[in-house]
Amino acid sequence: MQQAALVGHSMGSLIALEAAARSPQRATRLVMVGTAYPMKVSDALLNTARDSPLKAIDMVNAFSISSLACKPSYPGPGIWLHGANRALMRRMQAGQTGLNLFLHDFQVCDRYANGLQAAASVSCPTHLILGSLDQMTAPKSAAPLAAALQAQVHMIDSGHCLMQEQPDAMLASLKASLA
C-alpha cells in the first residue's frame, strides 16, 4: 500500500499522528478520534493501573461513557455497553503475560511528547472527532493540536467511547472526514 488515510482513537490517534508525520507522502488524510495533546494521565489512574488493573478498568469505564443508557439497545436488545467494555478490557489485560497492558498503554499516552513537532510535519487534511462529554480526553485539551494541524473539528454529544455511544454520528463524522 502506497498511501492511506490514517484513523486512530485515543492512544491510536497519537500513533496515527506520528505515522502521518513520519511518512507525510503516504498519508492522504488524518482523523484523530477522542484525542488530546498532551494526553496526560492522572497519577491516581497510573497508580491504580499499576497496583490494581481491574480497579483501573472500572475507573476508565466510568470515565469513558457519558451515560448509563446509551443509544437504545446498542448494538441490540440486551446489550449493556458498560459491561461489554469492562469484559473486553479485562480480556485484553488477562491475555498479556508478563506485561501490565493497562499500565503500559497509559504510560505511553502520558509520556508522549512529540505531538506538536509531529503536527508540524503533517501535510494532509486533518480532522478531529471529539466527544463533547469526554472525561478521558477533554475537548479543550485538543485545541492546541487542532490549531497546529489546522484541523477541522467535529463535536459529537458523547463521552470517550464515541463509536459505541453515538455510532451514527461517529460514522457520519468519519465519512465527512474521509470525503
Where are these regions (language model features)?
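Flexible "cap/lid" loop of the alpha/beta hydrolase fold
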Residues: L14-F63
